[in-house]
Every structure is written in structure tokens, then in C-alpha cells.
């Protein structure tokens, strides 16, 4: 057998063992020339138990009260950040005196849609005066005298 045939045989054995969980465990054990186990190989029960013991020892235990305090602080910071960002949106958007979250978001959406419409009409040459779209939600019509 040449190297290609050996490789193909080992490759098919690996694929078969991965697709068939009841396959012979010897098929899952493929050793290289030095006798070192490869990644796809099953570990012995003893080494698995040792691994579990090591993992249990390295895990740290967090008290539930510490975790709840941490969660409470995170939620409070999140609410404050949302409140600040809503205030910023309210300041940026003209004619938005409401303090309700839904009303602020409605004003911002309406203002953004009006700006998008003004940009579209300006790019199409339909309307050259962008000042027609300055108010949030209301198009100002004026007579140039």
C-alpha cells in the first residue's frame, strides 16, 4: 500500500466511526507513527474522570446574592443609558416635547422619514429648497414674496 491508499483507508475508517456511534472503538483509535493518540480518539474512562475532577476544582462558586446585586447594577446602568439616549434623541428632534418613550420614538421616526423624503426630492430635482422640510412631521409651505 502506498501513502495515498493508507490515508484513504484511515479517512474512511474515521468517517465511518463518526457516522456510526456503535462502531468498533478500535476504528476510532488511529495512531500515528509515534504511538500518540490523535484528536478523534476516545479517551479512557479513567482519564475522563480525571478531567472532570480537574474541571470541578477550577470552577469558582458565586453566591446568588452577589450575582443578584451585580445583575441589579447592570440593569440600572442599562436603564440610565437608555434614558440618556432618549433625552439626546428628544433634544435633536425638533418639536418633540413629549417625555413618553413611544411618543419620542414616533417623533424621531416621522422626522427621519421627512428628512429622507427631502433628500429624495432634492436628489431628483423635484424640490430645491430643503427648508420646506425643517419641522418634524410637518411640511412648511410658504409663499416667497
UniProtKB/Swiss-Prot annotation:
The residues covered by the bHLH domain are 66-115
What are the Basic and acidic residues biased-composition ranges? 33-49
Entry's InterPro entries? bHLH_dom, HLH_DNA-bd_sf
The main location class comes to nucleus
**UniProt subcellular location:** Nucleus
Record GO terms (molecular function):
DNA binding; DNA-binding transcription factor activity; protein dimerization activity
- Stated name of the protein: Transcription factor MEE8
Amino acid at each position: 500500500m502506498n501513502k495515498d491508499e493508507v490515508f484513504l483507508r484511515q479517512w474512511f475508517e474515521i468517517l465511518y466511526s463518526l457516522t456510526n456511534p456503535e462502531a468498533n472503538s478500535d476504528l476510532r483509535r488511529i495512531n500515528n507513527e509515534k504511538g500518540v493518540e490523535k484528536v478523534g480518539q476516545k479517551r479512557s474512562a479513567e482519564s475522563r474522570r480525571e478531567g472532570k475532577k480537574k474541571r470541578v476544582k477550577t470552577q469558582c462558586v458565586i453566591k446568588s446574592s452577589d450575582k443578584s446585586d451585580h445583575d441589579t447594577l447592570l440593569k440600572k446602568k442599562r436603564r440610565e443609558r437608555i434614558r440618556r439616549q432618549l433625552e439626546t434623541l428628544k433634544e435633536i428632534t425638533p418639536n418633540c416635547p413629549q417625555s413618553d418613550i413611544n411618543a419620542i420614538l414616533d417623533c424621531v421616526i416621522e422626522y427621519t422619514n421627512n428628512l429622507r423624503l427631502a433628500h429624495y426630492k432634492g436628489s431628483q430635482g423635484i424640490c430645491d429648497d430643503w427648508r420646506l422640510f425643517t419641522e418634524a412631521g410637518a411640511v412648511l409651505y410658504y409663499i416667497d414674496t
